[in-house]
Amino acid sequence: MSKNKQDAGLSTSAGLVRYMDEDASKIKIAPEKVLGITISIMVLLFILNYGLLA
């Protein structure tokens, strides 16, 4: 009886692994670009909040 329970767990795990392998996002952005955009927005907000341009 424990053999049947163990088989069910393995097939469930295998299905989850297959789902994660097939799940691909259509938007692909390099991590460097995400960091660059984030830092740019932070600098822009800092400049706008503290008025360093004038």
UniProtKB/Swiss-Prot annotation:
Places the protein is found: Cell membrane
Membrane topology (UniProt): Single-pass membrane protein
Gene Ontology biological-process entries: protein transport
Keyword Ribonucleoprotein (UniProt): no
Topological domain spans for side Extracellular: 53-54
Main location: membrane
Residues in the Cytoplasmic compartment per record: 1-30
This protein's UniProt keywords: Cell membrane, Membrane, Protein transport, Translocation, Transmembrane, Transmembrane helix, Transport
Keyword Protein transport among record annotations: yes
Membrane-spanning residues: 31-52
Gene Ontology CC terms: plasma membrane
Family: Belongs to the SEC61-beta family.
Protein purpose: Involved in protein export. The function of the beta subunit is unknown, but it may be involved in stabilization of the trimeric complex.
Oligomer status and interactors: Component of the protein translocase complex. Heterotrimer consisting of alpha (SecY), beta (SecG) and gamma (SecE) subunits. Can form oligomers of the heterotrimer.
Name under which the protein is recorded: Preprotein translocase subunit SecG
